[in-house]
Amino acid sequence: MARGKVQLRRIENPVHRQVTFCKRRAGLLKKARELSILCEADIGIIIFSAHGKLYDLATTGTMEELIERYKSASGEQANACGDQRMDPKQEAMVLKQEINLLQKGLRYIYGNRANEHMTVEELNALERYLEIWMYNIRSAKMQIMIQEIQALKSKEGMLKAANEILQEKIVEQNGLIDVGMMVADQQNGHFSTVPLLEEITNPLTILSGYSTCRGSEMGYSF
């Protein structure tokens, strides 16, 4: 039988809370040491208890060294993000270079290779641009096709509904025409009846005649 999820909440009993803290803290530090040994990872853990007592672990060197490494790595990431933000002049220069490359690539593609010499780096950059363009073109084409298919399905549904309405109207009109023809026939004195047999032979009469004939031959009278 599967066990349900246990809801995590604060342990109200202070003794139980302290015992759980000690056990979980020891398990966490043990797992950190094992991870450091197995994967050669540098791990630093800082824990403050509810009473403000400090517990820390540095698997490599000291905690101060790990903190300095953390600050240095965080600063490099922040600088990298800041470097990505170019000023308008640099951005305009980059765009101008891209435009020149694309114009040069177009001339090269359309056969003007004698006058336009492109390096391997320029050709690689042009190839990347072309791949991006092809992806965008295919995406736009697929979106248009999906929209057209949805429009056709919508029109198909509308045509089916209109066809059903027309069929219902045709059935109603045919019923009215049949009723009108029957009324007209009755007014003109024409009735459609099943032809009756003028003469129907009674089987009892045949049987009675046969019996009288046989009785006379044998000397009996009826």
Swiss-Prot record:
Main location: nucleus
Xref: InterPro entries: MADS-box/MEF2_TF, MEF2-like_N, TF_Kbox, TF_MADSbox, TF_MADSbox_sf
Gene3D superfamilies: Transcription factor, MADS-box
Entry comment describing in which tissues the protein is expressed: Expressed in leaves and spikelets (rice flower).
Gene Ontology molecular functions: DNA-binding transcription factor activity, RNA polymerase II-specific; protein dimerization activity; RNA polymerase II cis-regulatory region sequence-specific DNA binding
Residue ranges occupied by any K-box domain in the UniProt entry: 85-176
Alphabetized Pfam families for the sequence: K-box, SRF-TF
Segments forming domain MADS-box: 1-61
Function text: Probable transcription factor.
Name of the protein in its database record: MADS-box transcription factor 26
